């Protein structure tokens, strides 16, 4: 890894809450195979940073701690952390806006969601953090919920079937300190059809 442009903490230690999660995670792996837990532990580290600093990211020193815990070379942890886009290698805003811009979401209006993120979230574009530190906007790969496109993942939650107005409403709620209920902005049940008919009635023409 190249030298970071931001300030890295000098030390990192998992707190009691994180240690309890790690103990549960490591029980899933047989002796000698604990290195397979690198992704879950990276996630635990990122969640701890978000909980304690209001910015969910993984400092290099945390990766070193994970490497020591799992008895693996630090470079192997760096490789995993930098490969997956869900791990943040630098500080981000309080809320992470993760916009899917792949084909289904693009065809269903992700550009309008992006415009709303700029207008209501105060970000200049993808990769930017708002001046108040509340939002960071990232464009991500497919989130796997294409039938509910367009999708905006905020932190760990999916907000689906969005348009410009519903995205503005969503971000305004976060600005007020609220946590809107995840799911469809149009009241769709799970991935059911968007129209009024969502069951097979057996009536009408074949």
Segments and roles (model prediction):
Residues 1-206:
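Signature of N-terminal electron-transfer/Fe-S-associated modules in redox systems
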């Amino acid at each position: 890894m190249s030298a970071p442009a931001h300030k890295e903490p000098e030390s990192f230690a998992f707190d009691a809450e994180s240690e309890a999660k790690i103990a549960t995670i490591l029980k899933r792996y047989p002796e000698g195979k604990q290195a397979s837990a690198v992704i879950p532990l990276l996630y635990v580290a990122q969640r701890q940073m978000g909980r304690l600093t209001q910015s969910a990211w993984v400092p290099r020193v945390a990766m070193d701690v994970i490497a020591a815990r799992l008895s693996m070379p630090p470079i192997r942890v760096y490789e995993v952390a930098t490969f997956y886009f869900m791990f943040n290698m630098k500080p981000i805003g309080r809320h992470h806006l993760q916009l899917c811009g792949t084909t289904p979401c693009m065809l269903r209006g992700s550009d309008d969601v992006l415009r709303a993120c700029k207008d209501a979230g105060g970000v200049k574009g993808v990769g930017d953090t708002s001046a108040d530190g509340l939002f960071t906007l990232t464009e991500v790969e497919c989130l796997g919920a294409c039938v509910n496109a367009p999708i905006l993942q905020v932190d760990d939650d999916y907000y689906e079937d969005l348009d410009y107005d519903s995205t503005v409403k969503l971000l305004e709620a976060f600005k007020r300190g609220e946590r809107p209920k995840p799911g469809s902005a149009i009241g769709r049940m799970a991935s059911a059809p968007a129209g009024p008919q969502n069951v097979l009635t057996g009536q009408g023409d074949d």
